[in-house]
């Protein structure tokens, strides 16, 4: 067989079924084994007939093993890059970045300390998807790399060679070359042999000795905020770059803020504002995103601290005040996660259209979770829904919501429901926020029925503003 063929790894193993795509019947081992052998025979036959060569591009990383290098790049700039070197358990880790302070913050969260060392690093771009050479693989020298790249993109090959020779002129001991392709980012390290270079200078050898330099494949691991937010929602926009305020960091808002950050909020120049004047008490912990270490802390400040711990580069502003005294500035999206009806009405009046407003709340003792987004003057606001509910319209359940209170005395009473209900409300809010940023605001009113003993009264819909609403008919 050639040095590199599709579906055969470096260890000689044959990949005939993608991992995780087939469920084998453990109660039919003989039949399943025969089916696997039949599939493996079919794949191997196609390989021997010279087919499936195109699969080499999709499987490139299976043929490209090497030292891990972490890349935290938000810009598209090519050329020389900044590389931080970290010592961890006696080994060196490399982090390529376009923002040293941002990446250093991430490294501090891991307990890593940046050294004063650096590595000459270059970034080049190609139009070709990588695929291994079937004649000679893996590449061991610069000559092998250049021969390989000439079959993919001759222009990129020239750029790579120029950067390697530039590192030689700068008397570097080694350099990292990263190649941005349409499919992925991959790279390799070049090791400069100073003995050959000194001999070349002494005897005025005109040959280009860079072809003999040893290389080592580099496995690129992306840790940039854009990749982390978008990997699980490909082909969709994230919340990166948006100014978003979450009012209420309680049982809904805490989980919601966490999910929003995972969806890109507070990155790429955007900001996440958390507003809550309340503190965390023991009775809150059972259904709150925060825990015992945050006891008696302000919810907005503690949640901000927790999110920075999880995502060190996130831009968060905590406002431990009543939202009625807060200055939120220009917003792309306002989210009311307080579940307080009167405050929700005030927010609708104080932040009218064109500021998009998303309200998320829990109905009854966890009977249902609902969310309403207002993006147009013709659409209903949160106050409109109150008028409709009074007339028996747009309700969540056919039956009246049960009134269940727990606790002792007037000050200790509360509506009981588990944390799972809070998470479902936060999930619905995140879903609608992502739909909003992707231009989908319908249905504007969404309900997720949790209590299966109840009957859903209102399917997801787009309610118009209510004629009785004093805010929409002012």
Which residues make up each language-model segment?
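Glycine-rich phosphate/adenylate-binding loop
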Residues: 67-211, 330-333, 337-474
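Compact alpha/beta protein-protein interaction domains typified by the UBC
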Residues: 1-20
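Glycine-rich phosphate-binding loop and adjoining beta1-alpha1-beta2 segment
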Residues: 271-311
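Short, glycine/acidic-rich hinge or "gate" loops at secondary-structure transitions
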Residues: 51-63
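N-terminal charged helix/coil linker that caps or initiates catalytic domains
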Residues: 185-243, 267
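A structured beta-alpha segment of the ubiquitous adenosine-cofactor-binding alpha/beta core
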Residues: 302-330, 338-342
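Ser/Thr/Pro-rich, low-complexity mucin-like regions
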Residues: 35-53
């Amino acid at each position: 067989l050639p040095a590199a063929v599709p579906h055969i790894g470096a260890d000689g193993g044959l990949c005939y079924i993608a991992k995780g795509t087939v469920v084998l019947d453990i109660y039919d081992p003989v039949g399943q084994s025969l089916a696997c052998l039949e599939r493996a025979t079919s794949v191997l036959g196609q390989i021997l007939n010279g087919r499936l060569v195109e699969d080499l591009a999709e499987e490139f990383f299976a043929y490209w093993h090497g030292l891990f290098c972490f890349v935290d790049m938000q810009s598209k700039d090519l050329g020389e890059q900044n590389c931080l070197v970290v010592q961890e358990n006696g080994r060196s880790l490399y982090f390529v970045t376009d923002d040293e302070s941002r990446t250093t913050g991430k490294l501090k969260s891991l307990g890593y300390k940046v050294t004063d060392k650096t590595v000459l690093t270059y970034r080049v771009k190609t139009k070709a998807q990588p695929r291994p050479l079937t004649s000679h693989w893996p590449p061991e020298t610069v000559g092998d790399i250049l021969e390989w790249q000439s079959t993919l993109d001759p222009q990129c090959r020239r750029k790579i060679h120029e950067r390697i020779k530039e590192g030689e002129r700068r008397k570097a001991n080694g350099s990292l070359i990263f190649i941005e392709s349409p499919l992925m980012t991959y790279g390799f390290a070049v090791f400069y042999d100073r003995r050959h270079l000194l001999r070349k200078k002494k005897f005025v050898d005109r040959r280009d000795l860079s072809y003999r330099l040893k290389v080592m494949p580099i496995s690129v691991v992306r840790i940039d905020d854009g990749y982390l937010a978008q990997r699980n929602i490909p082909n969709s926009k994230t919340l990166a770059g948006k100014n978003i305020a979450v009012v209420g960091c309680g049982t809904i808002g805490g989980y919601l803020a966490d999910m929003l950050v995972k969806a890109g909020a507070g990155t790429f120049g955007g900001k996440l504002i958390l507003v809550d004047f309340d503190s965390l008490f023991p009775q809150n912990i059972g259904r709150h995103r925060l825990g015992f270490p945050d006891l008696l802390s302000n919810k907005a400040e503690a949640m901000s601290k927790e999110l920075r711990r999880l995502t060190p580069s996130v831009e968060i502003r905590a406002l431990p005040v009543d939202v009625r005294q807060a200055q939120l500035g220009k917003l792309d999206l306002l989210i009311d996660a307080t579940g307080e009806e009167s405050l929700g009405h005030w927010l609708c009046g104080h932040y009218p259209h064109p500021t998009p407003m998303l309200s998320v709340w829990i109905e009854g003792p966890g009977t249902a979770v609902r969310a309403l987004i207002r993006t147009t003057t013709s659409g209903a606001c949160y106050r409109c829904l109150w008028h409709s509910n009074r007339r028996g319209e747009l309700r969540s359940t056919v039956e009246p919501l049960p009134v269940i209170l727990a606790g002792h005395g007037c000050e200790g009473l509360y509506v009981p429901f588990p944390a799972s209900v809070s998470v479902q409300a936060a999930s619905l809010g995140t879903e609608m926020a992502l739909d909003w940023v992707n231009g989908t605001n319908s249905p504007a009113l969404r309900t997720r029925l949790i209590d299966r003993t109840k009957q859903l009264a209102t399917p997801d819909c787009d309610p118009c503003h209510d004629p009785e609403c004093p805010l929409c008919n002012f």
